[in-house]
Amino acid sequence: MTQDLERARERAEELRREIEHHNYLYYVLDRPAITDAQYDRLMRELERLEKQFPALVTPYSPTQRVGGRPREGFAAVRHLSPMLSLANAFDERELRDFDRRVRQALPGEQVRYVVELKIDGLAVSLYYENGILVRGATRGDGDTGEDITENLKTVRSVPLRLRRPVPALEVRGEAFMPKEAFSRLNEGREEAGETLFANPRNAAAGSLRQLDPKITASRQLDLFVYGTGYGEWGRAVFPDGERTAPQEHAEVLELLKELGFKVNPEYRLFDRLDELVEYCLGWQARRFELPYAVDGLVIKVNSLAQQERLGATMKSPRWAVAYKFPPEQAVTKVKDIFVRVGRTGVLTPTAELEPVRLAGTTVSRATLHNEDIIREKDIRIGDKVLVQKAGDIIPEVVAVLKEERTGAEKAWAMPGRCPSCGAGVVRAEGEAAVRCTNMACPARLQEGLIHFASRDAMDIAGLGPAVIAQLVSAGLVGDPADLYALRYEDLVPLERLGPKSARNLLEAIEASKGRSLARLIFALGIRHVGERAAKILANHYQSLSGLMSATQEELVNIPEIGPKIAASIVEFFSNEQNRKVIDKLVKAGVNTLTEKVIREGGGPLNGKVFVLTGVLKDFSRQQAQELIESLGGRISSSVSRNTDFVVAGENPGSKYEKALTLGVKILDENEFRELTGRK
């Protein structure tokens, strides 16, 4: 037994190191080296070992990322050094004033600045001892924050163990919610009739202060680190012992990256103030291209010795300033207010606006969320309104310019019947959402089909909203399973669907039968079940029938599946109509199992490295990647001597030329089909 335990201990530590390495490649460097399926196998092996030998479980094990039971509150934590706020600069003049103050305090010295993006999130502190995360906290009042260690452990970019055993290190960073995750979260909350988050920052803050870590884990947060509050770096970082600490802030950022932290790559060093100012002003427009929200840039004196001499006021350091972007708003007119019916029956009022340019795009619509918000803001048809993008993402009406009213404006009220089917509408107690009561409502059906066919679900090319509207109107489709019964003669008469398009659509529908179980679960449109939850459920149950028979008690014990998701799943599969649709899908031949090769860890392409270049005729880039990974292969973004195959479509790029130079096997699309068995 002792030998078994020792072997298990060695293997568990080996697995932890390997998983930590792949977390670093994926979440920090954005260079994954293995497939999701291969990563899941490593995690499952570690979970089995720790379950068999509970004494092996460590606080830094990757299996401990999702916390246990909800807590009653958060304990207070005192920071090792104050987490000060930053003084603000709102224009070029104030930036130059900051530089003047720095140079006056450091007469005759050369000053270099580091400029970093100011992430719009929640400031947090992470404390490590001997390379192990022991505590994480919010900023709080700067001296004392709240202990949110268990919640921060669920953020995949937070290392539980550093790549080197640094004796003591307090790291500062910004937790945030990516724009895409924020949009998905609010869409789900709107469908559920829940209060929406105003912006990604509020969403991140609310997510990290959840008493239940499983809810935090489901929110897909991320974190960039930007500095340290305290550091005993030791010989783990400086092995020669000639110095014991970094000397520049830019060096700190590089060291943090080497230790396993995610550092924002958009930082620059400047010697000349004019270039620094130009760089800051240039980000005002560029920020909208980023996948996360930023509200400015932070300018810091690079030399740590100079930082120490400059010191700080009671509120903020003298060696740093935050350049804040001016809020981008525009005035436009509400032309009309119309109601959209979602796939769960929620009636969402939307303002039709006179088109206006805002935050890099033309805005012609803005969601008004629900009737309560319209009443609260007193929004009327014909009003001139101030609009902005919440978190630079979602257009919203900020305020009504009531002084501009002429008397011709019209008040608006939520219709008492569904605008699509005429059925009655209801508003559940405690909810802001109004819902259509008709399960067979054409608008609900249409939105559900759009979701089912979408790229992240069953990915049926050519089946867009216009075609779906015609199919529903003609009575050809009453649920998603009916798509698989469509015939050529059903499609040809439809507008804009000639013989060729009809054949292509039928082929796309047929191809979708082979999509993964995770995609099918997501496509079903179960309330609160997003892409990540669908993958977790697929990996856990391995079959749709297994998920259908799951109890609520069983579901809540799955990491990241909380009570709300569990209740929604049980409710969905308890519905007789839903079960009939699934039965039709099974009879049509739609895949309801996980890939056997993924489950058993093998496949005809096992271990082979592929690079994709050019445009494939019959595969999207994502489809080709999923096919390769399902057969055991993996995708690389660049060609090297370790590459086994380059799949070349039309107009291949430089990767094709490099493959020729290195003698790497090049496959055209037909050869790729033969290799993967998709003839």
Swiss-Prot record:
Protein name: DNA ligase
Gene Ontology MF term list: DNA binding; DNA ligase (NAD+) activity; metal ion binding
Binding-site list for Zn(2+): 418, 421, 436, 441
Lineage: superkingdom: Bacteria
PANTHER family, sorted: CHROMOSOME TRANSMISSION FIDELITY FACTOR 18, DNA LIGASE
Stated role: DNA ligase that catalyzes the formation of phosphodiester linkages between 5'-phosphoryl and 3'-hydroxyl groups in double-stranded DNA using NAD as a coenzyme and as the energy source for the reaction. It is essential for DNA replication and repair of damaged DNA.
Family: Belongs to the NAD-dependent DNA ligase family. LigA subfamily.
Key words, A-Z: DNA damage, DNA repair, DNA replication, Ligase, Magnesium, Manganese, Metal-binding, NAD, Zinc
Family matches, as InterPro entries: BRCT_dom (IPR001357), BRCT_dom_sf (IPR036420), DisA/LigA_HHH (IPR041663), DNA_ligase (IPR001679), DNA_ligase_AS (IPR018239), DNA_ligase_CS (IPR033136), DNAligase_adenylation (IPR013839), DNAligase_N (IPR013840)
Catalysed reactions listed for this entry: NAD(+) + (deoxyribonucleotide)n-3'-hydroxyl + 5'-phospho-(deoxyribonucleotide)m = (deoxyribonucleotide)n+m + AMP + beta-nicotinamide D-nucleotide
Active site, per annotation: 118 (n6-amp-lysine intermediate)
Catalytic activity, EC: 6.5.1.2
Organism lineage string: Bacteria, Bacillati, Bacillota, Clostridia, Eubacteriales
Binding site for NAD(+): 36-40, 85-86, 116, 139, 174, 300, 324
Organism: Pelotomaculum thermopropionicum (strain DSM 13744 / JCM 10971 / SI)
Cofactors, names only: Mg(2+); Mn(2+)
